[in-house]
Swiss-Prot record:
It holds the Pfam family ATP_bind_3. The keyword Cell inner membrane does not apply. The thiolation reaction likely consists of two steps: a first activation step by ATP to form an adenylated intermediate of the target base of tRNA, and a second nucleophilic substitution step of the sulfur (S) atom supplied by the hydrosulfide attached to the Fe-S cluster. One of its GO terms (molecular function) is magnesium ion binding. InterPro entries: Rossmann-like_a/b/a_fold (IPR014729), TilS/TtcA_N (IPR011063), tRNA_Cyd_32_2_STrfase (IPR012089). This is tRNA-cytidine(32) 2-sulfurtransferase. Keywords: 4Fe-4S, ATP-binding, Cytoplasm, Iron, Iron-sulfur, Magnesium, Metal-binding, Nucleotide-binding, RNA-binding, Transferase, tRNA processing, tRNA-binding. Its EC number is 2.8.1.-. GO terms for biological process: tRNA thio-modification. [4Fe-4S] cluster binds at C124, C127, C215. Belongs to the TtcA family. Coiled coil: none annotated.
Length: 353
């Protein structure tokens, strides 16, 4: 009896892990499609720090390689900055075991930073600039056309609020941009992924995590404050973070105040009404629930009830790992089976990834 119960528990745990991986894969695929992050023949340099985010990024991209509509190659790159206690063997051993092409760059930026920054001060800014330059150079040497970073949705929102609260700017962290040297495209495929999902996935996969505080730098207190604020909102107002991110994708320049984005001086009597005109004092009709709630609801719907036409290449394995009740939901959806495999819809918007 106990063995049977344990088997059911393990089956449910595996089902939840598979479901989590599908969600991460879906979000990454959607971001890649929305921002045209990857094109045919791209060689993508995945910057691997040894943290949960970069491990997850690498695994999801490797997974997508199997079914992506374009061919692309991956090379994992780690920068050994000679920080005291850095376990230099961890990443090479992991990557070799996974069969991933990799390259380790060794540059003693640790002592450069320590010489320049007074004791007790945050070294992250100078360290990141040095690291960025080295990674750009490495990308050129390896023939990479894309540089993939592991920043996720929470990082992007934190950067937005940091710039708003402390810099007086509406500026975030773009999912895709040109590198400082003008030679490479930098992409953030995890832009739609939540940190809590990445943390759960990394724990389930038991990645060999390398601590991020080996340099001894003081934490960025401003970023900590913003992070605490967003986490508190997540607890008290589910869906708010998703709604905030959606707002970053729905900007109305004529209803802000930046003269560089909109020609306010060019507005004359008789001009056409722009973006609905003056509705500042109107009672706006907002939905009863934040827009971001739909994203959360989509993830909790039974797979058969989601409106999507994408056939997941791994749906048979996904359905088989589910508890019996979930298997029935997966196998009796409104869409027909193809080649004997159940069609499992994954999202309301779906890319060809």
């Amino acid at each position: 009896m106990r063995k049977a119960k344990n088997a059911v528990v393990m089956q449910k745990q595996q089902y939840n892990i598979n479901k989590l991986q599908k969600r991460l894969r879906r979000h990454v695929g959607q971001a890649i499609a929305d921002y045209a992050m990857i094109e045919e023949g791209d060689r993508i340099m995945v910057c691997l720090s040894g943290g949960k985010d970069s491990y997850t990024l690498l695994e999801i991209l490797r997974n997508l390689q199997q079914s992506a509509p374009v061919n692309f190659s991956l090379v994992a790159v780690n920068l050994d900055q000679k920080q005291p206690g850095f376990p230099a063997h961890v990443l090479p051993e992991y990557l070799a075991a996974q069969g991933v092409e990799y390259h380790i760059v060794t540059e003693d930026t640790y002592h450069i930073v320590k010489d320049k920054i007074p004791e007790g001060k945050t070294t992250c800014s100078l360290c990141s600039r040095l690291r960025r330059g080295i990674l750009y150079r490495t990308a050129t040497e390896l023939g990479a056309t894309r540089i993939a970073l592991g920043h996720h949705q929470d990082d992007i929102l934190q950067t937005l609020f940091l710039n708003m609260f402390y810099g007086g700017k509406l500026k975030g962290m773009p999912p895709k941009l040109m590198s400082d040297d003008g030679k490479h495209i930098v992409i953030r495929p995890l832009a739609y992924c939540r940190e809590k999902d990445i943390a759960r996935f990394a724990q389930a996969r038991q990645f060999p995590i390398i601590p991020c505080n080996l340099c001894g730098s003081q934490p960025n207190l401003q970023r900590q404050v913003i992070g605490d604020m967003l986490r508190d909102w997540d607890k008290r107002y589910p869906g708010r973070s998703e709604t905030l991110f959606r707002a970053m994708q729905n900007v109305v320049p004529s209803h802000l105040s930046d003269t560089h984005l909109f020609d306010f001086k060019g507005l004359m009597q008789g001009s056409a009404v722009v973006d609905g005109g003056d509705i500042a004092f109107d009672r706006e009709s907002f939905p009863a629930q934040p827009a971001g709630w739909q994203d959360l609801m989509d993830d909790d719907l039974p797979v058969s009830s989601r409106n999507d036409n994408w056939t997941c290449s791994n749906c048979a394995e996904y359905a088989q790992s589910a508890p019996p009740t979930q298997q029935r939901k997966a196998l009796t959806g409104p869409q027909a089976r193809i080649a004997g495999a159940p069609v499992i819809p994954l999202a309301t918007r779906h890319p060809p990834w």
